[in-house]
Design a protein with these regions (language model features):
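Short, Lys/Arg-enriched N-terminal segments with co-localized hydrophobic residues
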Residues: 1-11
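Hydrophobic beta-strand-centered segment that forms part of the acyl-chain substrate-binding groove
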Residues: 57-105, 120-121
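Short linear sequence elements within intrinsically disordered, low-complexity coil regions
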Residues: 43, 51-54, 86, 92, ...
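Hot-dog-fold acyl-thioester-processing enzymes
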Residues: 13-76, 131-150
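HotDog/MaoC-like acyl-thioester-processing domains
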Residues: 12-26, 81-87, 98-150
Length: 150
């Protein structure tokens, strides 16, 4: 077969991504509505699972992570789909702190089977905190920085 297009080697890699400090492990029970015509979880639901894990992690901080003046935005998403998620079943979403910057945090993610033996997806998201008035980046909330290790 021809070689992959230049610059796509990492994206097409079958090797799981390296991740940092574990922030959250959230079990999720699959729902019938998550399925597609192929009788496995639709790929768009993977993003919903990640969103739910991020929000639960933010809420677990015990301090403000969003205010009237500042809020996080999803700036980038990278998802490697490794194996379909069959129904019925359960999964675990794991979030990790991969990088902590001045106004952003890169959160690694893994979606595995409940017993951790099957990796369904991995990758990362970049969250940037902005000033709601100006739309410009603003420093990370202290709780996010402290817990994520920055």
């Amino acid at each position: 077969p021809p070689p992959p297009p230049q610059g796509t080697r990492h994206l097409m890699s079958h090797e799981p991504a390296e991740h940092g400090k574990v922030l959250q492990r959230m079990p999720i029970e699959l729902r019938w509505r998550d399925l597609d015509a192929f009788n496995h979880v639709n790929n768009s639901n993977f993003m919903t699972y990640l969103e739910e894990a991020r929000i639960r992690w933010f809420e677990s901080l015990g301090e403000e992570w969003v205010t009237d003046a500042t809020a996080p935005l999803l700036a980038a998403v990278q998802m490697n789909y490794r194996q379909p998620i069959p129904y019925p079943g359960s999964i675990v979403v794991e979030l990790t702190a991969d990088r902590v910057g001045t106004s952003s945090v890169t959160l690694g993610h893994r979606i595995t089977s409940a017993d951790g033996t099957v990796l369904h997806a991995d990758g990362h998201v970049v969250m940037v905190w902005i000033d709601r008035g100006s739309g410009r980046p603003t420093p990370l909330p202290a709780a996010v920085r402290r817990v994520a290790g920055g």
